[in-house]
């Protein structure tokens, strides 16, 4: 009995030491931060899926208002949360060559070689290749596709609202984003079978994976094990879909001018060239194989589907809660569409300046894809501090923390589109608003995402007004099991046909 006790006690002591071995790292360097919990570090509530990781980082940000940086532990791994905007600007922009890798490494197989997750030279080659596909000139051709899907969506909404004015908004607008993304990316018309398949993929793509926590504890292990954070069911779907579409088009672009057309046109021109060396990186080239194309179409779908649907839902919620703002947007929509004969074009969107301000204020309050991570590629003296990051360590930036900081946004809980008037934007620090990231790794598809949201909102407000319902919540708790910001209770609103 005594022997069992001694062995058990020894085992617990060893495990305790192992899982706390790094927890004096920041204290030894005089960097303040919250006390870590054994095994979990500072993210226990996220690991047990009690609280969204985004809100944990926001709480840490707010707990240390006088600090430029805060020492934290993602599981047992020391990381640095950045609070000071000038420090963030250095890391994300000025010293980007030392921080061009994201915080999670995993296998390039199974869609891992997408532009969002790719690191090093592979990311540089992909960025050089795909950036020209997301210019205003290229995306203008997709506006007609979005608008057409918007018209069909409105007819469906009319039928729903005839039966029941109160609607759960997120699943409703997802029907638009799913149709818009699939037609703009793949040129597909959705049938019931495809809709059912994509609905199943939604939970697989956007449900948090414990692979993230494993990589936090043992950085780089997923890559060493040739493993991914994505479900094994996702890659075959996008691989097969991409292969089928390419075969249907004979491997050549058509006249649709959707994303697949632009990629096939790029492949025909062989537009990928080697990059110059940066620091100790090796120059690489990258062939646009079907697998590489599948990885890009996957991330385009994943990034544009859920984020746009959530942003639209939060935007409509704020319009319902602020009817004076809603009426101002409706007036702008009506007047602008009248000038353009009801057509939604690039000029139409450009002239709806107040709607654009509402869009940005929505993402200020609800940055749906919030956390920014970067890995140091070499030892780095953090500007304005006595802190030195070691090569391979990760920095964390909390968009929620910054967006709710009264130093940058007085009365941050208030929904105020005037924060994004041209004058206010000019006077604000460039890193005080980061819903799409910052620097060269800023979201390539941000213009597409903004247009997709605006097109749908224009279509909806042309026909309806939105009001709170009996189920409308005034505050949101975010689902810790979802990868992005998603309200657990949903968003319910009454959709009321406009009386002209």
Curated annotation (Swiss-Prot):
Localization in the cell: Endoplasmic reticulum membrane; Microsome membrane
Binding residues for heme: 443
Gene3D superfamilies: Cytochrome P450
Keyword annotations of the record: Endoplasmic reticulum, Heme, Iron, Membrane, Metal-binding, Microsome, Monooxygenase, Oxidoreductase
Molecular function per GO: heme binding; iron ion binding; oxidoreductase activity, acting on paired donors, with incorporation or reduction of molecular oxygen, reduced flavin or flavoprotein as one donor, and incorporation of one atom of oxygen
Keyword set includes Heme: yes
Membrane topology: Peripheral membrane protein
EC assignment: 1.14.14.1
Reactions performed catalytically: an organic molecule + reduced [NADPH--hemoprotein reductase] + O2 = an alcohol + oxidized [NADPH--hemoprotein reductase] + H2O + H(+)
Cofactor: heme
Induction: By furnocoumarin.
Top-rank EC class of the record's enzyme: oxidoreductase
Classification via Pfam families: p450 (PF00067)
GO cellular component terms, A-Z: endoplasmic reticulum membrane
Similarity remark: Belongs to the cytochrome P450 family.
Free-text function comment from the UniProt entry: Enables the insect to feed on furanocoumarin-producing plants and evolved as an adaptation for detoxification of xanthotoxin and other furanocoumarins. This isozyme metabolizes isopimpinellin, imperatorin, and bergapten at high rates, xanthotoxin and psoralen at intermediate rates and angelicin, sphondin, and trioxsalen only at very low rates.
Name recorded for this polypeptide: Cytochrome P450 6B4
Species lineage: Eukaryota, Metazoa, Ecdysozoa, Arthropoda, Hexapoda
């Amino acid at each position: 009995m005594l022997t069992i006790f001694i062995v058990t006690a020894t085992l617990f002591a060893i495990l305790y030491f192992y899982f706390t071995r790094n927890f004096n790292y920041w204290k030894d360097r005089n960097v303040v931060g919250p006390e870590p919990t054994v095994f979990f570090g500072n993210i226990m509530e996220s690991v047990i899926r009690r609280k969204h990781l985004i809100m944990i980082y926001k709480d840490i940000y707010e707990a240390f208002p006088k600090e430029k940086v805060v020492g934290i532990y993602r599981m047992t791994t020391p990381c640095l949360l950045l609070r000071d905007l000038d420090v963030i600007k250095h890391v994300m922009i000025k010293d980007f060559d030392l921080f061009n890798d994201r915080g999670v490494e995993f296998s390039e197989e199974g869609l891992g070689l997408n532009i969002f997750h790719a690191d090093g030279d592979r990311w540089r080659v992909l960025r050089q290749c795909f950036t020209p596909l997301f210019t205003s000139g290229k995306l203008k051709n997709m506006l007609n596709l979005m608008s057409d899907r918007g018209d069909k969506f409105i007819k469906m909404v009319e039928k729903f609202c005839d039966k029941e004015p109160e609607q759960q908004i997120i699943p409703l607008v997802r029907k638009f984003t799913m149709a818009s993304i699939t037609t703009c990316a793949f040129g597909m018309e959705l049938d019931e079978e495809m809709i059912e398949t994509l609905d199943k993929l939604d939970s697989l793509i956007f449900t948090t994976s414990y692979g993230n926590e494993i990589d936090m504890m043992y950085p780089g292990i997923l890559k060493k094990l040739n493993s991914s954070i994505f479900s094994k069911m996702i890659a075959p779907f996008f691989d097969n879909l991409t292969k089928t579409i390419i075969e249907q088009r004979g491997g050549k672009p058509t006249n649709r001018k959707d994303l697949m057309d632009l990629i096939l046109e790029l492949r025909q021109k062989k537009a990928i060239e080697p990059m110059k060396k940066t620091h100790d990186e090796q120059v690489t080239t990258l062939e646009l194989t079907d697998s590489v194309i599948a990885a890009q179409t996957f991330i385009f779908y994943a990034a544009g589907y859920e984020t746009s649907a959530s942003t639209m839902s939060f935007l409509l919620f704020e319009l319902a809660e602020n009817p004076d703002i809603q009426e101002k947007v409706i007036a702008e929509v009506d007047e602008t569409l009248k000038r353009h004969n009801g057509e939604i074009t690039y000029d139409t969107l450009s002239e709806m300046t107040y709607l654009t301000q509402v869009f940005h204020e929505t993402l200020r309050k609800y940055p749906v894809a919030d956390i920014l991570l970067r890995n140091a590629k070499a030892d780095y003296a953090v500007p304005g501090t006595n802190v030195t990051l070691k090569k391979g360590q990760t920095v964390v930036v909390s968009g929620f923390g910054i967006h709710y900081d009264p130093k940058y946004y007085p009365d941050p809980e208030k929904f105020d589109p005037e924060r994004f008037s041209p004058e206010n934007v000019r006077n604000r620090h460039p890193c005080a608003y980061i819903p799409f990231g910052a620097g060269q790794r800023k979201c390539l598809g941000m213009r597409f995402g903004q247009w997709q949201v605006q097109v749908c909102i224009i279509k909806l407000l042309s026909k309806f007004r939105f009001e709170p319902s009996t189920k409308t919540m005034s505050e949101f708790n975010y689902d810790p099991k979802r990868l992005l910001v998603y309200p657990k209770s949903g968003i319910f609103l009454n959709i009321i046909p406009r009386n002209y």
